[in-house]
Amino acid sequence: MTAENATLLEPVLGKDEIGWMFVQEYYTYLNKEPNRLHCFYTKKSTLIHGDEGESISLCHGQQEIHNKILDLDFQNCKVLISNVDSLASSNGGIVIQVLGEMSNKGKLSRKFAQTFFLAEQPNGYFVLNDIFRFLREDVEEEEESPDAVEKEKKDVASEPYVNGVQSQEHLPSAKEEGHYQDPAATENNFATAALISNETDSLNQATLAVPEEPVIQVTEASVPSFVSQQENQLQDEALTSNSKNADAIGASDANVATAPKSWADLIARNHPDVKSQASVSSTASTTGQTVKGVNADQTQQPTAPYTQSNELLETSVFVKNIPPETSDVSLKSAMSIFGPVKAIEFARRKGTAYVDFVNHECVQLALNKKTLQINNATLNIEERRRLFSGKFNKSGDKKSNDNYNGMKRNFRKGNRGAFDGRSKEVTTSKKQNN
């Protein structure tokens, strides 16, 4: 096979793949050989390096860029890349934008944005333009005012409840339109809390009258609601046949005390779209079965918002900038100053970990502290962000499910100082064909 035919068979790498290879090679030199980082530039290159909003001077030429890199004093600089975008530009050039976090000399990591323009040269590419900026991290989240929270508490506390269900005086007749929840759906705590809150809001907006027909009050275990007029013929028959039992139940409502506002009720107000689903046949059977066991169940069944609210609170935090020589035992011991530690998931290669405490109070103490000193290094403690479902992924997965969203891809090592835009597989293919 001639050299011309071999050249035609060589695959041409895309601009995005060349960009990936460059980014991997550039930050590898930044970590291991920062004194040779100027080899990526030429006398035509320009560089800007500073903080967001800072007025800085332009570095022109390879020598000025080299002096600037020496002034930055990179030592054991670690970079966590979260995003890389590459686009083809004019004259065969490539524009690359990098987002991530950088930690130098073991200090706290800072978010940054860096943009490269790779220009073509006979043997590959070189960095013609380089813009680097550290980003500010002073964005404040809006919090709900204490007055609004206190007002919501008073509104909910004024509603009469019996084991999480409104008393007979505040219940509409069985023929009013509403929603019904299947008893099997009580396993979903959010759905239960949202259902109670939605019914409360709708009742406050409507003018209610004492129903002429007996109204059957039931416990949280069966979670009743109201069926539309077109679907409740079977329920009307059950209500009529059990009127005596309902009268006895209604007499006991005089002694009902108001229930305090719960955390789950607050959550329910923020989820107005949560609705229950059930069939008409299950409505009839639930109503008939609930009448007989109301008095006994009222003293035995606790309300769902009280029994399940603590399970919804976060009990773990995300810790980064952990020195690789730190052991699991020493990390657990250091984090124990905030409270008992249940488990630790330590990604030693990334220098990050998830620390799971026994309760939410320990998490609050850790987040308020924000930093922790260990092995002459400052650990950064952040809130665990659950962007995807599932547990902490092992290293090597394509995506992470929580605080990780870095690029995890294998790169092929390029030439020092320039990139030829070709993979090693091309050389192997040529040898086999020859």
From Swiss-Prot:
Single GO molecular function: mRNA binding
Keyword Transport: yes
Stretches the record annotates as Disordered: 141-180, 274-308, 390-434
Gene3D superfamilies in the cross-refs: 3.10.450.50, 3.30.70.330
Biased amino acid composition, Polar residues: 296-308
Lineage, top ranks: Eukaryota, Fungi, Dikarya, Ascomycota, Taphrinomycotina
Location of the NTF2 domain: 18-134
Domain RRM: 315-386
Superkingdom of the source species: Eukaryota
GO annotation, biological process: mRNA transport; stress granule assembly
Record's compositionally biased regions (Basic and acidic residues): 148-157, 419-428
Record's compositionally biased regions (Low complexity): 276-291
Keywords assigned by UniProt, alphabetized: mRNA transport, Phosphoprotein, RNA-binding, Transport
PROSITE patterns per record: NTF2_DOMAIN (PS50177), RRM (PS50102)
Task of the protein: Probable scaffold protein that may be involved in mRNA transport.
Pfam families assigned: NTF2 (PF02136), RRM_1 (PF00076)
Name assigned to this protein: Putative G3BP-like protein
Cellular component annotations (GO), alphabetically ordered: cytoplasmic stress granule; cytosol; Ubp3-Bre5 deubiquitination complex
